[in-house]
């Protein structure tokens, strides 16, 4: 299909950027649900920087799964990764939204609502 000459390239690029962002968010949604259900966000927020093995032990989850989950969450900017120490951490701002159920900005329950849809 040929692109009509009346296409606004700036609008097209903006829409493509929006679509890529939406697809990334959709791909991360199941991981957010798992992080909430398994207590991974909470454990990471409470303990401070942890290796994947240490977080897996705290959460009672398989280390391989936790390692993959951590890598995806770091890539999405939900947590941070310190390559020198090979540890992951949750910044306090993210902890308020993802781990602190008493926070007025906690969105953990939203993951369950999205899953139910």
Where are these regions (language model features)?
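N-terminal accessory segments
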Residues: 1-117
